[in-house]
């Protein structure tokens, strides 16, 4: 299997996000890298499902709450940006203050 550097980066994000999902299921609070990976995967999967950029930006603040992350993580994650492939091309999705 031959992967481009961008594909390798996305695969790393997916791996970290799956670990974060498992930790959430066990009731553990996410740290900064886990929270960012989790949110990034939601963007990637939403784009793959055909959700629009505007819809992802609107719903993005509902994916994680303050009680699901370690103290201070919500303040550290002021913005998450992910380049995702939509049915009509690749677009940059930005979530502002995604953990509320």
From Swiss-Prot:
<dbReference type="GO" id="GO:0016151">
    <property type="term" value="F:nickel cation binding"/>
</dbReference>
<dbReference type="GO" id="GO:0009039">
    <property type="term" value="F:urease activity"/>
</dbReference>
<comment type="similarity">
    <text>Belongs to the urease gamma subunit family.</text>
</comment>
<dbReference type="GO" id="GO:0043419">
    <property type="term" value="P:urea catabolic process"/>
</dbReference>
<dbReference type="GO" id="GO:0005737">
    <property type="term" value="C:cytoplasm"/>
</dbReference>
<comment type="pathway">
    <text>Nitrogen metabolism; urea degradation; CO(2) and NH(3) from urea (urease route): step 1/1.</text>
</comment>
<dbReference type="InterPro" id="IPR012010">
    <property type="entry name" value="Urease_gamma"/>
</dbReference>
<keyword id="KW-0963">Cytoplasm</keyword>
<protein>
    <recommendedName>
        <fullName>Urease subunit gamma</fullName>
        <ecNumber>3.5.1.5</ecNumber>
    </recommendedName>
</protein>
<dbReference type="InterPro" id="IPR050069">
    <property type="entry name" value="Urease_subunit"/>
</dbReference>
<dbReference type="InterPro" id="IPR002026">
    <property type="entry name" value="Urease_gamma/gamma-beta_su"/>
</dbReference>
<keyword id="KW-0378">Hydrolase</keyword>
<dbReference type="InterPro" id="IPR036463">
    <property type="entry name" value="Urease_gamma_sf"/>
</dbReference>
<comment type="subunit">
    <text>Heterotrimer of UreA (gamma), UreB (beta) and UreC (alpha) subunits. Three heterotrimers associate to form the active enzyme.</text>
</comment>
<dbReference type="Pfam" id="PF00547">
    <property type="entry name" value="Urease_gamma"/>
</dbReference>
